[in-house]
From Swiss-Prot:
This is Putative B-type lectin protein L288. Gene3D superfamilies: 2.80.10.50. It is a single-pass membrane protein. GO terms for molecular function: carbohydrate binding. Glycans are attached at N79, N94, N104, N114, N165, N190.
Length: 204
């Protein structure tokens, strides 16, 4: 074999090897399996005070704190008490635990659907007063003690504080516990469990 022939064969072999390596590189990157990342589910749309208020005004629902429900103890009337009680299954008659927000941000009970009496603060509604919650004849101004504004809590986008419109530093508070009247208390931190409320619409 001449030297020239040997060089030609060597060059051909090198070119074939380079072509093979190029093909393998292409195949590896073209057809390698890329694992599909697990789905985290649809994104949660952050609630806003406006969206919460709209939901409360759109229909009846329960107002809950740590699995217990705001409850009218009897047919609403002047000074009728409102307590935090164990939630009743919606398949049963839980009208005493169903609420709706009026156009001026007051809460009425399904036991009084015409809205004669509203959820009210018994007392001056001053910060730190620990005034109890009860029913009183509805007023027309949303700046009264009967007006409430939801405030989003950063630690849980589904829960919120209910701030009293007369004194915007006081919130609806369930700290007295089960079968007791909630109170108006100074709004605490976002992690204050007794002030974490959620409105759950009742399907008609």
């Amino acid at each position: 074999m001449s030297k020239t022939t040997f060089i030609i064969i060597a060059v051909i072999i090198i070119l074939l090897l380079l072509a093979l390596l190029g093909f393998l590189f292409y195949w590896r990157h073209r057809y390698r399996h890329t694992p599909t990342p697990p789905s985290s589910g649809p994104p949660v749309t952050p609630a806003t005070p406006a969206s919460i208020t709209k939901a409360m005004q759109s229909g009846w629902g329960t107002i809950e704190n740590q699995g217990n429900c705001l409850t009218a103890t009897s047919n609403p009337g002047a000074n009728t008490s409102i307590e935090l009680q164990t939630c009743i299954n919606p398949s049963s008659d839980n009208s005493s635990q169903q609420w709706k927000m009026t156009g001026n941000n007051s809460f009425i009970s399904k036991l009084d659907p015409n809205g004669t009496y509203c959820l009210d603060v018994d007392g001056t509604a001053s910060v730190g007063s620990s005034d109890q919650i009860h029913f009183w004849q509805c007023q027309q101004q949303d700046t009264t003690k009967m007006g409430w504004t939801p405030k989003i809590t950063t630690n849980n986008p589904l829960n919120y504080q209910l701030v009293n419109n007369k004194t915007t530093s006081a919130c609806l508070d369930a700290s007295p516990g089960i079968n007791k009247q909630p109170i108006l208390q100074t709004c605490g931190a976002n992690t204050t469990a007794s002030q974490q409320w959620v409105f759950k619409p009742i399907s008609s």
